[in-house]
């Protein structure tokens, strides 16, 4: 297999300043991932910090908690504005949920109000679709858009880790499907019901995955995002 941590990939982010929403979740791992690609990674907690970044990552964690804290720290509205203005954003796991325009099974607060998202991606997601923590699993995925990493034998699959991950149940006409979990995946045949489930999508400058590339050391998804920021993908 080719090594995703090639010299070229370690320089692709040079000169870029990429923010990672650092309210909750595995934001540190994402900062390390973009820095491994040569970019400057910065934690984002305040509205003013959104002004000086080239792109933003919304990490995995608890989507309801990130939503709540984004209001407390008053970054929700400015972030939605930046997304509408075209800021490149990548969301992993909970980040995918928060970028979705619709949640099929939203959590509710004590008053019965459904959780909200930042939106931007014309998709419907289902939370914890693959099950709870004990149903976490790993698998290899064919992932579109990684041609820049092709070796003599083509593009290696992406090794993906799913931890209480969502899946996408609907995509709008402007959304490209990048990866799906095989319906015959051994550990989730009953859950998948014979349907290939969408776990990675892109629409314009927005990218989202159900899984956590920052956990496995798989840098190509972050490299794809960086190339999107540069207008090279």
From Swiss-Prot:
Its EC number is 4.3.3.6, 3.5.1.2. It catalyses: aldehydo-D-ribose 5-phosphate + D-glyceraldehyde 3-phosphate + L-glutamine = pyridoxal 5'-phosphate + L-glutamate + phosphate + 3 H2O + H(+); L-glutamine + H2O = L-glutamate + NH4(+). GO terms for cellular component: cytosol; glutaminase complex. Pfam families: SNO. The active site is at residues 93, 212, 214. Gene3D superfamilies: 3.40.50.880. Disulfide bonds: none annotated. One of its GO terms (biological process) is glutamine catabolic process. In the presence of PdxS, forms a dodecamer of heterodimers. Only shows activity in the heterodimer. HAMAP family: PdxT (MF_01615). Catalyzes the hydrolysis of glutamine to glutamate and ammonia as part of the biosynthesis of pyridoxal 5'-phosphate. The resulting ammonia molecule is channeled to the active site of PdxS. This is Pyridoxal 5'-phosphate synthase subunit PdxT. The lineage of its organism: Bacteria, Bacillati, Actinomycetota, Actinomycetes, Micrococcales.
């Amino acid at each position: 297999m080719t090594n995703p941590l090639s010299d070229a990939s370690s320089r692709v982010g040079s000169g870029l300043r990429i923010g990672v929403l650092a309210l909750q979740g595995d934001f540190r791992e994402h900062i390390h991932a973009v820095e491994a690609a040569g970019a400057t990674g910065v934690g984002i907690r305040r509205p003013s910090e959104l002004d000086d970044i080239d792109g933003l990552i919304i990490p995995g964690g608890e989507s309801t908690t990130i939503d709540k804290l984004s209001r407390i720290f008053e970054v929700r509205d400015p972030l939605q504005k930046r997304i509408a203005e075209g800021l490149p954003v990548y969301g992993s796991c909970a980040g995918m949920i928060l970028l979705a325009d619709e949640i099929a099974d939203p959590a509710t607060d004590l008053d019965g109000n459904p959780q909200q998202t930042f939106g931007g991606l014309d998709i419907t997601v289902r939370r914890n679709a693959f099950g709870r923590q004990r149903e976490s699993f790993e698998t290899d995925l064919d992932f579109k858009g990684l041609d820049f990493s092709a070796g003599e034998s083509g593009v290696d699959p992406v090794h993906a880790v799913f931890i209480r991950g969502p899946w996408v149940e609907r995509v709008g006409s402007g959304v490209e499907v990048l990866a799906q979990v095989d319906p015959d995946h051994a550990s989730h045949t009953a859950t998948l019901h014979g349907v290939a489930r969408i776990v990675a999508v892109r629409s314009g400058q927005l990218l989202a995955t159900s899984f956590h590339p920052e956990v496995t050391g798989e840098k190509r998804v972050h490299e794809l995002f960086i190339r999107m920021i540069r207008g090279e993908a």
